[in-house]
Amino acid sequence: MDEKVFIKTYLSIAEDLIVWYRNIREVHRNLDNFLVLLSVANFHKKEITEGVVGSPNIDDQELTSKSIIARIPKEKGMSINGIVRETGIPRTSVKRIIDRYLKKKVFKKNSQGLITIGINYRSNNKQRRIASYHFFQQVTKKTKAHALQLSEE
């Protein structure tokens, strides 16, 4: 592999990552908020996928959120310690972030005190998508070109 091409691709992706991080900060105030949100979303990815696909109107955030929430078993959720382990964020910060998301109904606690998705989970979904779209589009383009070059070698 040509070292110059690798470095050029790496630096180009790093530049896009900086832009993506700025966009994430605009939407979520900081990366920790975003990581906690992603951690809970990743835990519920099956229910989110099924809920979005099963929703009669994907553009209706409330209807889609209800479709997702209906698919989450009552006993399923993530503990604060699980989020701390997954994200590497200090427990006090995770607790503060979760409390803020609980007030906004982005998250809710189930009967066992586990964190799960709330009715307003999709409230800033469009901003998240806009903030991430350019970054993932650029990374895909750059890594495809790099992968093609590697396969030719």
Regions found by a protein language model. Give the residues of each.
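N-terminal leader segment of winged-helix/HTH proteins
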Residues: M1-L38, N42
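Charged/polar positions within long, soluble alpha-helices
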Residues: R22, D99, K103-V106, K141-L148
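Amphipathic alpha-helical interface surfaces
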Residues: D32, K76-S79, S93-I97
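Short helix->loop/beta-hairpin flanking segments within DNA-binding domains
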Residues: L35-K76
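Short, cationic-aromatic polyanion-contact patches
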Residues: Q61-K66, S79, V106, S111-F136
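A short alpha-helical element within helix-turn-helix/winged-helix DNA-binding domains
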Residues: I69-A70, E75-R85, Y101
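Short amphipathic alpha-helical interaction segments
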Residues: G88-K103
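Amphipathic alpha-helical dimerization/coiled-coil segments
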Residues: A131-E153
